[in-house]
Design a protein with these regions (language model features):
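Short, surface-exposed beta-strand/strand-loop-strand elements in extracellular ectodomains
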Residues: 90-101
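Extracellular/virion structural assembly segments
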Residues: 1-67, 74-92, 106-124, 130-261
Length: 261
């Protein structure tokens, strides 16, 4: 497992800037088989593997040559790109992002972790992601691009960042005389609980509940400006039911996230 990085070093000329620390949930993606192309793919790693929410299978380039992923977004608002489970953390490898063929994220290295690039809102017709300098053919399991859901209330205290919510299933071995020999890790994931209070009735119903109802995996950043590395690719586990907290209709809700980081 590894940490995640949010890129906040980009300010676009159009749209509304992020205030900074509202939690971001990237759950809707514009990238589909109908509007996405890539320079190359393999029989075992087709483009379609990257365009669903399973982290078990990859898109894989057929060579180490420069690869360009092109998504025709048709003028729909975009403010984030999410990449989960990949091999892009290679020496010399860079990615570049362009909106309508204008560079918005200059060539930059990628670290070995879930990546969420948060941007100012824009409405490009075409988004391109160029991968150059690979020493090993590029692989990506999940690619999302779209408009992130920004939480109405910031999270301040009582929250476990997903990167620190380690859940480990392991077997510890001991000798007959009680000496520690070693351990076998059977499974390792991340988890956290999200608790939101005093949500306005309209915001909950119009903005948050569609995500709760969809129950699809998402990119999650709890406090993007202060803790940019604390991001995961997560899904809801168990019940997620809102309650009416006040006579004015204010709502509250808690749910558990399970995921990878």
């Amino acid at each position: 497992m590894s940490l995640a990085v949010i890129s906040r070093d980009l300010i676009l000329s159009q749209g509304v800037l992020l205030s900074g620390n509202e939690g971001a949930i990237g759950w809707q993606t514009l990238a589909t088989a109908a509007n996405t192309t890539v320079t190359s793919e393999t029989a075992a790693g087709p483009l379609s593997n990257m365009l669903n929410n399973s982290t078990a299978f990859y898109w894989q380039a057929s060579s180490t040559a420069t690869q360009t992923i092109t998504i025709t977004t048709g003028g729909t608002q975009v403010d984030y790109i999410g990449i989960a489970r990949h091999n892009l953390a290679q020496s010399g490898l860079t990615i570049t992002v362009k909106f309508d063929y204008v560079t918005v994220v200059p060539a930059r290295a990628v670290v070995d972790q879930t990546t969420m690039i948060l941007l100012s809102e824009a409405s490009p017709t075409t988004v391109t992601i160029t991968i150059a300098g690979a020493g090993t053919a590029a692989k990506i399991a999940v690619l999302y691009i779209g408009q992130a859901l920004k939480l109405e209330r910031n999270i301040y205290v009582g929250h476990t960042p997903i990167t620190y919510g380690r859940d480990i299933s392991e077997i510890n071995a001991m000798s007959e005389n009680g000496q520690y020999i070693g351990r076998i890790v059977r499974n390792e994931t991340r988890s956290t609980e999200i608790t939101l209070r005093n949500l306005t009735p309209a915001w909950y119903r119009e903005s948050l509940d569609p995500f709760i109802a969809a129950r699809v995996p998402c990119f999650w950043a709890w406090r993007p400006l202060d803790y940019a590395a604390e991001v995961g690719f997560c899904w809801i586990e168990g019940a997620a039911r809102p309650v009416n907290e006040r006579s004015n209709g204010m709502m509250g809700i808690s749910w558990n996230f399970k995921g990878i980081a």
